[in-house]
């Protein structure tokens, strides 16, 4: 049985991993819109890696009979208007 603090921290990490994936996907969309397909692809790969991390934590928690709580994913607050941003 997992300690309640460990459960909470792991659940928080699941949500952080999904937020990171969301952020990388936002970067990918930005670079794609600028015609920089290589950068867009790199950020897509990073987004997938973050989703994979989240799912590993989910699986671990589920295997330990812990119900995962998925929070809303916040909109990334990173201004990206130019390549210099």
Question: Residue spans of the language-model regions?
Answer:
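Iron-associated oxidoreductase/ferritin-like identity signal
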Residues: 1-85
């Amino acid at each position: 049985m997992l300690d309640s603090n460990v459960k909470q921290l792991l659940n928080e990490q699941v949500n952080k991993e999904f937020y990171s994936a969301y952020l990388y996907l936002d970067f990918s969309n930005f670079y794609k819109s600028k015609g920089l397909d290589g950068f867009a692809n790199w950020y897509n790969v990073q987004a997938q890696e973050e989703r994979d991390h989240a799912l590993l934590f989910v699986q671990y928690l589920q295997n330990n009979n812990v119900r995962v709580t998925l929070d809303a994913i916040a909109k990334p607050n990173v201004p990206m208007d130019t390549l210099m941003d």
